[in-house]
């Protein structure tokens, strides 16, 4: 997953960076860094994002 894909997914789910961070168990600043290519998007992130997407943002 690319930084742009991460941001697009977050926005499609209607989540703020803070809300996504909470669901991923990371800091909001880390989400920002991942969306801007300053931190790697890990396999763990991808697995959790697929679960969030499957379950919906509610």
Question: Residue ranges of each PLM-predicted region?
Answer:
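DNA major-groove recognition helix of helix-turn-helix
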Residues: 24, 34-35, 45, 53
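Residue-level detection of the helix-turn-helix DNA-binding "recognition helix"
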Residues: 11, 25, 36-38
């Amino acid at each position: 997953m690319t930084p742009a894909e991460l941001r697009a997914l977050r926005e499609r789910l209607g989540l703020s960076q803070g809300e996504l961070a909470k669901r991923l168990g990371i800091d909001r600043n880390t989400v920002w860094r991942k969306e801007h290519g300053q931190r790697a998007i890990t396999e763990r992130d991808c697995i959790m994002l697929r679960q969030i997407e499957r379950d919906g943002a509610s």
